[in-house]
Amino acid sequence: MVAAKKHVPIVKKHKTTFARHQSDRFDRVGSSWRKPKGIDGRVRRRFRGTIRMPKIGYGSNKKTRFLTPSGHNAFLHNARTLSCAAGCSMQSTDPSAAEIATPVSSRKRIASSPARQADRCSRSRRSKFRPRRLRAS
């Protein structure tokens, strides 16, 4: 692996899940967040004891938002962007690193390609493939 870059310390804040108002009371109200827009809404008026609304203070630092723990920008998520990765973004001065997303099925093919030459390709050796065990009948 490539040594870590010098960067601002990466601080991962506690991630809060914001639930929709009264989604715990009714099945017909989904839990995904919606901003309350009613004129009398307690959540919109930020009363004590109500659920929290998303705001800018929950965000992380802009300089370190999408950095990997080694300080590189992750940019590769599919096999299509691999051709650009081999040519332009894998030079030694570029702060980018190829990070293969977890659900990418062509992970092994990407990892064995020439773009892996700079050894800045993360999540390449981990494979969730487990052979199925046959039942003895």
UniProtKB/Swiss-Prot annotation:
Give a yes or no for keyword Amino-acid biosynthesis in this entry.
no
PROSITE patterns cross-referenced by the UniProt entry: RIBOSOMAL_L32E (PS00580)
Q: Which domain of life is it from?
A: Eukaryota
The alphabetized UniProt keywords are: Ribonucleoprotein, Ribosomal protein
SMART domains this protein is in?
Ribosomal_L32e
| Entry keyword Ribonucleoprotein | yes
Q: Where are the transmembrane segments?
A: none
Region feature (Disordered): 95-137
Any GO BP annotation: translation
Molecular functions per Gene Ontology: structural constituent of ribosome
| CDD domains membership | Ribosomal_L32_L32e (cd00513)
Any Pfam family from its record, for instance, is Ribosomal_L32e
Any one cellular component term from GO for this entry? cytosolic large ribosomal subunit
| Alphabetized PANTHER family for the sequence | 60S RIBOSOMAL PROTEIN L32 AND DNA-DIRECTED RNA POLYMERASE II, SUBUNIT N, RIBOSOMAL PROTEIN L32
What family is this?
Belongs to the eukaryotic ribosomal protein eL32 family.
- Full protein name: Large ribosomal subunit protein eL32
Organism phylogeny: Eukaryota, Fungi, Dikarya, Ascomycota, Pezizomycotina
Q: Which gene encodes it?
A: rpl32
